[in-house]
Curated annotation (Swiss-Prot):
Belongs to the bacterial solute-binding protein 5 family. Residues 1-25 form the signal peptide. This is Probable D,D-dipeptide-binding periplasmic protein DdpA. The gene is ddpA. Pfam families: SBP_bac_5. Part of the ABC transporter complex DdpABCDF, which is probably involved in D,D-dipeptide transport. Induction: Induced by RpoS in stationary phase. CDD domains: PBP2_NikA_DppA_OppA_like_7. GO terms for biological process: dipeptide transport; protein transport. Keywords: Peptide transport, Periplasm, Protein transport, Signal, Transport. The complex is composed of two ATP-binding proteins (DdpD and DdpF), two transmembrane proteins (DdpB and DdpC) and a solute-binding protein (DdpA). Disulfide bonds: none annotated. InterPro entries: Peptide/Ni-bd (IPR030678), SBP_5 (IPR039424), SBP_5_CS (IPR023765), SBP_5_dom (IPR000914). It is found in: Periplasm. The lineage of its organism: Bacteria, Pseudomonadati, Pseudomonadota, Gammaproteobacteria, Enterobacterales.
């Protein structure tokens, strides 16, 4: 009897399978599945500057302050996260924070001022990209369990806002002590140790990462008991899995896949104004691109509007310079390169040492990068330059860029906090060359001085003048090719509610307040 009972539904299933499409079960209501193109490179907040990594790290840690939510919109203003209050001295050189008394790490131990002190000292000691947001001589003191004092040698205008970025995450001191031999870099590259609403439970490389709620988080309990970040390399596969209900969110889909989803109308495809920009690195540090005339020729050769219309299907706009529209300090009157073959040829004629070929590095990290590379190859061919395309694994490409081993490369950038510092100081300060931000290895003492001046005052009017003056110089020097700023588009299951987009936190989902 048991056999006959088990046989009939099996037989029925076989019959149905041969006559009807397979029905896919929806993801349970208490679970969220996010489809992403690639694994994180590292989960260490003191190392990662990649938004793709922040999908996991941001909800796993807390910081002293966090970005506010204004209704259903993300704000660039900040409010307390671990901090209940703070004050700055009149000269802006001392900042004192009082901690809330109910925050706990995922192992149940309380978050103390000493944890804040150790986390920042580790960040500065490691000295990777995230540390670049903070003064190198920053001093941190913990006079008691609930008080943290930061001392700066000079005013640093964006300081409060830097404390909301991922690098300012507070790490469990017990983990730092247990793995002290390498400053916990090995452990934290693959694990989380924070007090955020979620924590990493498991990571199967190339397959998925699983996040579960931190049982000791004092805030409202999340609606999701499990968040799965599935690694689905092919964009068409991410789109298909979203369409049939296997995943709830498909991240980083190219325009053609988003358009297909819009036509199907099974899921929501939302667009949000973004500060994320795409640009070309031109290696200023070595021949032949150490010649400004050649860099200008490339800038005038680039078909910006063709890329916006063709590659983005109009979902973006050409940049005018390094400070994007929507960020204070933007200069609508700044000189803007456009596709002008006559001007490109005029600059080319000035080039002393004309190259016959250049290399262009890109990866599959962004589906738009390959068509941009092909468009650049076509444009420069008209000047007589053969562009050799090198498609690499993203980690390999980043390594090459960090070493300055390239001619042209491509990247995306989005700010960690709402200040032109994130663009101007990172991209152009001579002490930030390589992966920290100055990926064109640009150096100009006049620009360095203006950028330092912009950090020495909290007077936003004066800071705007300094940044705009520096911007005019770097635009003329054609340090980079400023391509476009893109709207952020996200495809999501219609059942998912409560997502709040913050332009400071692309690819970061507020999974602790979302629901189905």
């Amino acid at each position: 009897m048991k056999r006959s009972i088990s046989f009939r539904p099996t037989l029925l299933a076989l019959v149905l399978a041969t006559n009807f499409p397979v029905a896919h079960a929806a993801v349970p209501k208490d679970m969220l599945v996010i489809g992403k193109a690639a694994d994180p490179q590292t989960l260490d907040p003191a190392v990662t500057i990649d938004n793709n990594d922040w999908t996991v790290t941001y909800p796993s840690y807390q910081r002293l302050v966090q970005y506010k939510t204004d209704g259903d919109k993300g704000s660039t203003d900040v409010e307390g996260d671990l901090a209940s209050s703070w004050k700055a001295s009149d000269d802006q050189k001392e900042w004192t924070f009082t901690l809330k008394d109910n925050a706990k790490f995922a192992d149940g131990t309380p978050v103390t001022a000493e944890a804040v002190k150790l986390s920042f000292e580790r960040l500065l000691k490691i000295g990777q990209g995230p540390a670049e947001a903070f003064p190198k001589d920053l001093k941190i003191d913990a006079p008691d369990e609930h008080t943290v004092k930061f001392t700066l040698s000079q005013p640093f205008a964006p300081f409060l806002y830097t404390l909301a970025n991922d690098g300012a995450s507070i790490i469990n001191p017990a983990v730092l002590k247990e793995h002290a031999a390498d400053d916990a870099r090995g452990f934290l590259a693959q694990n989380t140790a924070g007090s955020g609403p979620f924590m990493l439970k498991s990571w199967q490389k190339g397959q998925q990462l699983v996040l579960v709620p931190n049982p000791h988080y004092p805030g409202n309990k999340p609606n999701f008991k499990r968040v799965s970040v599935k690694i689905i390399g092919e964009s068409a596969s991410r789109r298909l899995q979203l369409s049939r209900g296997d995943i709830d969110i498909a991240d980083a889909l190219p325009v053609d896949q988003l358009n297909a989803l819009k036509q199907e109308n099974k899921v929501n495809v939302a667009e949000y104004p973004s500060l994320r920009v795409t640009y070309l690195y031109l290696n200023n540090s070595k021949a032949p691109l150490n010649q400004a005339d050649l860099r200008r020729a490339i800038s005038w050769s680039t078909d910006y509007q063709g890329m916006v219309n063709g590659i983005l299907s109009g979902n973006g706009k050409q940049m005018r310079g390094p400070i994007p529209e929507g960020m204070w300090g933007y200069d609508a009157t700044a000189m803007q390169y456009n596709h002008d073959e006559t001007k490109a040829k005029a600059e080319w004629d000035k080039v002393t040492s004309k190259p016959t070929s250049l290399t262009f590095l890109y990866s599959d990290n962004d589906p738009n990068w390959e068509p941009i590379a092909l468009a650049t190859q076509s444009s420069l061919n008209k000047l007589g330059i053969i562009v050799k395309l090198e498609k690499l694994a993203n980690a390999t490409m980043r390594d090459r860029v960090g070493k300055g081993d390239y001619d042209i490369a491509i990247g995306n950038w989005s700010p960690d906090f709402a200040d032109p510092y994130m663009f101007m100081n990172y991209w152009f300060e001579s002490d930030k060359k390589g992966l920290p931000g100055n990926r064109s290895f640009y150096e100009n003492s006049e620009v360095d001085k203006l950028l330092r001046n912009a950090l020495a005052t909290t007077d936003q009017t004066q800071r705007t003048r300094d940044y705009q003056q520096a911007q005019k110089i770097v635009i003329d020097d054609a340090a980079y090719v400023y391509l476009f700023q893109k709207n952020y588009q996200l495809a999501m299951n219609k059942e998912v509610k409560g997502f709040v987009f913050n332009p400071m936190l692309e690819q970061v989902f507020n999974i602790n307040t979302m629901s189905k």
